[in-house]
Curated annotation (Swiss-Prot):
Known pathway: Secondary metabolite biosynthesis; terpenoid biosynthesis
GO terms for biological process, alphabetical: triterpenoid biosynthetic process
Family recorded in the similarity comment: Belongs to the terpene cyclase/mutase family.
Example GO molecular function: beta-amyrin synthase activity
Alphabetized NCBIfam families for the sequence: squalene_cyclas
EC numbers: 5.4.99.56
Active-site residues, Swiss-Prot/TrEMBL: D486
Pfam families: SQHop_cyclase_C, SQHop_cyclase_N
Entry function: Oxidosqualene cyclase involved in the biosynthesis of limonoids triterpene natural products such as limonin, a compound with insecticidal activity responsible for the bitter taste in citrus. Converts 2,3-oxidosqualene (2,3-epoxysqualene) into tirucalladienol, generating rings and asymmetric centers in a single transformation.
Protein name, UniProt field: Tirucalladienol synthase OSC1
């Protein structure tokens, strides 16, 4: 039986190290002796329920670890369930009951180190590169055991569409990228060309060939297929490693790039520069025949470089970008790959590129910045030295990415531990039931204190294009090491709120110097021109560089941008901080808030909403924006932006009293309700929180009551809420499953409703 283990790692291994005793780490291990018949039956029931409903609800309920934790804690929901009948008013007692049921359930699924585990996955291209890398390096069978393979295949079967393909994420229609990667994953894991549940392989192969064959895969796919030997590097657009030795005044210098873009193309350029190709095994030769629609040796590789299937094409390459690729392909690459330039320049560039890779690996404890980068960096280390220490350290951190749900085994971004914990603790504190959850608050507080980044990246971090990180919080755990602005803002807000509570309940408050470090980090990321806050590093590079975005299915990934959600979270954190610590950088904080408020007002869309960059979509963005405006002193009466936002929310309310938004809002950039105007508990909770922030209860609380009625009536018997549509997004067009949102936001909405909306006894 599979079990989730928390805050564990081999401290004696020379190939694994940690900055804080592995606090926040979450890994899955299989124990063949574990599990009673009842436990095993419970897990199997969850799997079967997902399978039967897989075409209706695509994201998993993330139930396996929840079942484990609830069993380990002997949790039983002892508060009777409540429902609100049509025509009945919601009483204070009813709201309190529903809130406490949600709070007790949420408290029971806290991990031993104080964080809340959760799936943070959804894209179908996260997992396969791990399989590709391990296949090439010869470690596939040792890292992915028979039990791993069974669960990986379960995941692929569960998310295969009826047309035989897979999307770029679990809710997206079939695409070449998702289908080819999933097909290769099945074949490399040992399935034959006609094997798999419900003819999975044959159906997938038919989809690929019916849509033109593998030459139509997007550029990221072309890179991996070239590495595997199913494509030729001459069929890809150049990614020269000389990029990393350019002088800093060059417009597209790496220091001007968004960190994730930088760290994807760093190892890609190394592998491209070496023209590395894995072993051409009989299976690889067979895959060449299966995936191409013409004989492999007859393909004109030069002509396929710019091909991309219409199913994958979200961001077409502008003419100026294709001109750049063609110039590099026809002019510079022939020179750089021949003597003497291959010795004078290319070899130097390859060495410098690997130095950057090693620097990033070391500063993330070989977790790397994310799951797309991890297998690329790991493979680059193996290519440099198959028996080297760097590659061995990479192998030990693969487990940090593996996640298991009732839908099978997947790879996640790297984890949302700190983000979920900060939001979850704030929801619990809003309940005003500290006496019932004091140990939960204390453990969560302890986790946040241990998760804060204590130092900057080692060595010359500026020379490695890094921003300072001391005082920040990451999205996941401290070992990951990458600072994030909204995680820092929510973490800071959380520890400040906890500092107002008795230390005998929640533990000693954080030292002021560490709070100052967090403030310094947040102040450093405000854009001087717009007043908006970036996420990882300073924004400010020319947005014209986005014309060079090579990724056909994502947008806005070349340079760092500013974001409404991050800006709003920082306003909330600073408003509380300056109240408690009025003398630290007072003038700078006040100026920050003024500029940030103007930025949020300027970013409002024509319909009164705000675009959500990290959640779906306009309802999510509007909730954060209104929270920031409200704490800064803006009200319905003195702020036109708030009045317009309220109109948007009231117009978007569904007939059932709730709210529900389609993920299609994100790529289309237009508010799109769910089909049939269905509601979700997360969107409903976000809208309720927004209306409460905007003072709707003082004017007409009816829309709020209707939304809360839906939340209360949706609550499950054990205090959980149902899993519905996917709720996260990144780079406009790729969705991400935040499994904990269905607990955090309804709990917070019920707590704020009970506290701020007058209710009858």
């Amino acid at each position: 039986m599979w079990r989730l283990k928390v805050a564990e790692g081999d401290k004696n291994s020379p190939y694994m190290f940690t900055t804080n005793n592995f606090v926040g780490r979450q890994i899955w291990e299989f124990d063949p002796k574990a599990g009673s018949p009842e436990e095993l039956a419970e897990v199997e029931e969850a799997r079967q329920k997902f399978y039967k409903n897989r075409h209706n609800v695509k994201p998993a309920g993330d139930l396996l670890w929840r079942l484990q934790f609830l069993r380990e804690k002997n949790f039983k929901q002892r508060i009777p369930q409540v429902k609100v009948k049509d025509g009945d008013a919601i009483t204070y007692e009813t709201a309190t009951t529903a809130m406490k049921r949600a709070a007790h359930y949420f408290s029971a699924i806290q991990a031993s180190d104080g964080h809340w585990p959760a799936e943070n996955a959804g894209p179908m291209y996260f997992l396969p590169p791990f399989v590709f890398c391990l296949y090439i390096t010869g470690h596939l069978n040792t890292v992915f055991t028979v039990e791993h393979r069974r669960e990986i295949l379960r995941y692929l079967y569960n998310h295969q569409h009826e047309d035989g393909g897979w999307g770029v994420h679990v809710e997206a229609p079939s695409s070449m990228f998702g289908t080819v990667f999933s097909y290769l994953c099945m074949r490399l894991l040992g399935l034959g060309p006609n094997d798999g549940e419900n003819n999975a392989c044959a159906r997938a192969r038919k989809w690929i060939r019916d849509h033109g064959g593998v030459t139509y895969i997007p550029s990221w796919g072309k890179n991996w297929l070239s590495i595997l030997g199913i494509f030729e590097w001459s069929g890809t657009n150049p990614m020269p490693p000389e990029f990393w030795i350019l002088p800093s005044f060059v417009p597209l210098h790496p220091s001007k790039m968004w960190c994730y873009c930088r760290l994807v193309y760093m190892p890609v350029s190394y592998l491209y520069g070496k023209r590395f190709v894995g072993p051409i095994t009989p299976l690889i030769q067979q895959l060449r025949e299966e995936l191409h629609t013409q004989p492999y040796n007859e393909i004109n590789w030069r002509k396929v470089r710019h091909l991309c299937s219409k199913e994958d094409l979200y961001y077409p390459h502008p003419f100026v970008q294709e001109l750049l690729w063609d110039t590099l392909y026809l002019a510079s690459e022939p020179l750089l790959t021949r003597w003497p330039l291959n010795k004078l320049i290319r070899q130097k560039a390859l060495k410098e590129t690997m130095k950057f890779i090693h620097y990033e690996d070391h500063n993330s404890r070989y977790i790397t910045i994310g799951c797309v980068e991890k297998p690329l960096c790991m493979l680059a280390c193996w290519v440099e030295d198959p028996n080297g220490i760097a590659f061995k350290k990479h192998l030990n951190r693969i487990a940090d990415y593996i996640w298991l749900g009732e839908d099978g085994m997947k790879v996640q971004t790297f984890g949302s531990q700190t983000w979920d914990t900060a939001l979850g603790l704030q929801a619990l504190m809003a309940c005003n039931i500290a006496d019932e959850v004091e140990s939960v608050l204390g453990k969560g507080h302890d986790y946040l204190k241990k998760a804060q980044i204590r130092d900057n990246p080692v060595g010359d971090y500026k020379g490695n294009f890094r921003h300072f990180s001391k005082g920040a919080w990451t999205f996941s755990d401290q070992d990951h090491g990458w600072q994030v602005s909204d995680c820092t803002a929510e973490g800071l807000k959380c520890v400040l709120q906890l500092s107002l509570m008795p230390p005998e309940i929640v533990g000693e408050k954080m030292e002021p110097e560490r709070l100052y470090d967090a403030v310094n980090f947040l102040l450093s990321l405000q854009d001087e021109k717009t007043g908006g806050l970036a996420v990882w590093e300073r924004a400010g590079a020319s947005l014209l560089l986005e014309w060079l975005n090579p990724v056909e299915f994502l947008e806005d990934l070349i340079v760092e941008h500013t974001y409404v959600e991050c800006t709003a979270s920082a306003i909330e954190a600073f408003m509380l901080f300056k109240k408690l610590y009025p003398h630290h950088r007072k003038k700078e904080i006040e100026n920050f808030i003024v500029k940030a408020v103007h930025y949020i007002e300027d970013e409002q869309t024509a319909d009164g909403s705000w675009y959500g960059n990290w959640g779906i979509c306009f309802i999510y963005g509007t909730c954060f924006a209104l929270g920031g405006l409200q704490v800064a002193g803006k009200t319905y009466n003195n702020c036109l932006a708030i009045r317009r936002a309220v109109d948007f929310l009231l117009n978007a309310q569904s007939d059932d009293g709730g709210w529900g938004e389609s993920y299609k809002s994100c790529p289309n950039k237009i508010y799109t309700p769910l089909e049939g105007k269905r509601s979700t508990v997360v969107h409903t909770a976000l809208a309720v929180l927004s209306l409460i922030s905007a003072g709707q209860a003082d004017r007409d609380p009816t829309p709020i009551h209707r939304g809360v009625k839906l939340l209360i009536n949706s609550q499950l018997e054990n205090g959980d809420f149902p899993q519905q549509e996917i709720m996260g997004v990144f780079m406009r067009n790729c969705m991400l499953h935040y499994a904990e949102y269905r607990n955090i936001f309804p709990l917070r909405a019920l707590a704020e409703y009970r506290k701020r909306v007058p209710l009858p006894n």
